[in-house]
Structures are given as structure tokens and as C-alpha cells.
A protein has these predicted regions:
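Divalent metal-coordination and catalytic microenvironments
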Residues: 4, 35, 44, 61, ...
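Conserved beta-strand hairpin/beta-sheet module of binuclear metal-dependent hydrolase folds
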Residues: 1-47, 140-142, 183-194, 212
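Active-site metal-binding motif and surrounding structural segment of the metallo-beta-lactamase
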Residues: 38-89, 113-119
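Active-site-proximal loop/helix segment associated with metal-binding centers of metalloenzymes
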Residues: 125-206, 212-214
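Metal-dependent catalytic neighborhoods of phosphoester/phosphodiester hydrolases
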Residues: 69-77, 98-101, 260-269
Length: 297
């Protein structure tokens, strides 16, 4: 199962209807928790997800609305008796803050800290890129390797059936038949998480060609001066990011508390997002990952 669970959508100040940040990506057997702000543990309960589903925690930067929920989440994992390793990724410059937060949680969890200081691969399929915020900040990108989808009619025409199908998949060639002769390319799915940044090259690299992009939408286009001052994206810039990367679906979040209704922000995004599907997130949304695409080949 692949699903994106929205736990909180506010930025610096929570509101009556929006909790601080928190997002859980359920990706087959893994659960990647992004930027757990205050109240994340309770939001998980309301969303119907379990702390035991978390296998990896990814923090973009150490501003409080992106990490102050960490002790509660870790304590809940200990309480629930989580036995599997939990990997925690964060910018190396914020290690003192992260270690202080971790120290507040009960001991006993197999927690493995992975500070990173440059862009690149930080785990199999998971990479980071530097963003442009007031402190060191990184976005995350998850990439599934490409695969092949077998075509039954081509297998039948080639006379391949039963155990030979598995052999062909493993070896790539069987009795003169190549795997690519009886299949089409199945591009791996791609996900990107871009928070707290002004427009920058790192954000563009993260968003490039992804099926699902989660991006901040802190300010309206009318408040571009504030966005520039605090190094955040405007709605229009979020749309540009999606259009430039040919993104499939864009989920907007991290809304300023000054906007009670965010639909006008979504409208500003859509005006510049090209063919990208645009969704304004609400707390406790559960969004199925977009269906994988199949390419002829």
C-alpha cells in the first residue's frame, strides 16, 4: 500500500483547524514520517495510523514547527514496544537540537541517527537536496527503480509460460527471447517533499518528474514581500515548481495562520501549475499515492 497521510498543515502558528506540520508516507512496508511538529502523536491517533508503522523519520530543518513533536512520537514508539530499527535523518548543523529532543524520549528504542551535511543519497532510494531557508534546510526525494510489466499476449506468442516466466524475469533472456521483447517499461514512482524554502535549484531538482510533490504554500502572491523576507514560497512559486518539474500531483501545505480559507491559495497555484493536479491539504487527509504510469517500450 502507498498512501500519504496528512497529520498537520499549519506553519509557525497552529490554528483551531490546523495542527503543526506532520506527514506520514506509507510506502509498501515502510513508513516515512516527515517533519513531526507539536501534537503529531495525537494527530496520528486521530488519523488512524500507528507509531509502529514508522520506520524512518525525515526532518528538513530544526525550526520548532518541524521537529518539536519528535519526543512524543519516539516515546509512543517505546510505549508500543516497537522492535524494528528506526532511522532518523536530519541536517548535521541541527544535531545538537535533535539529540536534545531525542534525550527527552524514553530509552529502549533502536533509534539510528543519520545526520547529513550535503546533498545526495542518504538511504537506498532516498536522497536530499539543499533548500534556501533561514537555517540549513534540506528537501527529500524518494525514487523507486524502474521495472518491467509483462504482457501475457507476448509471452504466449513467444511460448513462455509457467516457471520459465520467472526465469526470464531473473535472467533477462531465455531461449532467444529478451525480457524487453515481452514487456513494457514500468517507471518507478517518485515522491518529493519540499518545505520552508525560497525558490531555488534544490527545490527544482527534487520536484523534477515526480508523481507526487508535497510543497509548502506559506504565502499568497499578494504577500510576496513576506515570502522573500522569511524565505518561503508563494502560491504562484509553488505552481511554477510543479509546472517546471512536470509533476503529476501537487499537495499544498504549511499555510500561514493569516489565511482562514486556503482555497484562494490553491487557485493561485493552479493558475501557474500547468497540467499538474493541485490539492490543498487538510489535517487528517489520507491521499492514495497516484497510480503508477506504464510506458510503451
Amino acid at each position: 500500500m502507498r498512501e500519504f497521510v496528512v497529520l498537520g498543515t499549519a506553519s509557525q502558528v497552529p490554528t483551531r483547524t490546523r495542527n503543526h506540520n506532520g506527514y506520514l508516507l506509507l510506502w509498501d512496508g515502510e513508513g516515512l514520517l516527515f517533519d513531526p511538529g507539536e501534537g503529531t502523536q495525537r494527530q496520528m491517533m486521530l488519523a488512524g495510523v500507528s507509531a509502529s508503522q514508522i520506520t524512518r523519520i525525515c526532518i528538513t530543518h530544526v525550526h520548532g514547527d518541524h521537529c518539536y513533536g519528535l519526543p512524543g512520537v519516539l516515546s509512543r514508539m517505546v510505549l508500543d514496544g516497537v522492535q524494528h530499527p528506526v532511522h532518523l535523518h536530519f541536517p548535521a548543523s541541527g544535531e545538537d537540537v535533535v539529540r536534545a529532543l531525542v534525550s527527552l524520549a524514553s530509552p529502549g528504542l533502536d533509534l539510528r541517527l543519520h545526520p547529513h551535511g550535503v546533498g545526495g543519497m542518504v538511504a537506498p532510494g532516498l536522497e536530499v537536496r539543499p533548500l534556501n531557508h533561514r537555517i540549513e534546510t534540506y528537501g527529500y526525494r524518494l525514487v523507486e527503480p524502474d521495472g518491467r510489466t509483462l504482457l501475457p499476449e507476448r509471452l504466449a506468442a513467444a511460448g513462455i509460460s509457467g516457471p520459465d516466466v520467472g526465469r526470464l524475469q531473473r535472467e533477462g533472456r531465455l531461449a532467444g527471447v529478451r525480457l524487453e521483447d515481452v514487456s513494457v517499461l514500468r517507471p518507478g514512482q517518485r515522491f518529493a517533499f519540499v518545505m520552508d524554502t525560497a525558490a531555488c535549484t534544490g527545490a527544482e531538482e527534487l520536484a523534477d518528474g515526480v508523481d507526487l510533490l508535497v510543497a509548502e504554500c506559506t504565502f499568497s502572491d499578494d504577500d510576496a514581500a513576506l515570502a522573500e523576507q522569511y524565505r518561503h514560497l508563494t502560491a504562484g512559486q509553488a505552481g511554477d515548481l510543479a509546472a517546471g518539474g512536470d509533476v503529476g500531483t501537487l499537495i499544498l501545505t504549511h499555510f500561514s495562520a493569516r489565511y482562514e480559507d486556503v482555497e484562494f491559495l490553491a487557485a493561485q497555484v493552479k493558475a501557474r501549475a500547468g497540467g499538474t493536479i493541485v490539492l490543498a491539504a487538510n489535517d487528517l487527509d489520507r491521499i492514495p499515492f497516484p497510480k503508477r504510469q506504464r510506458m510503451a517500450g
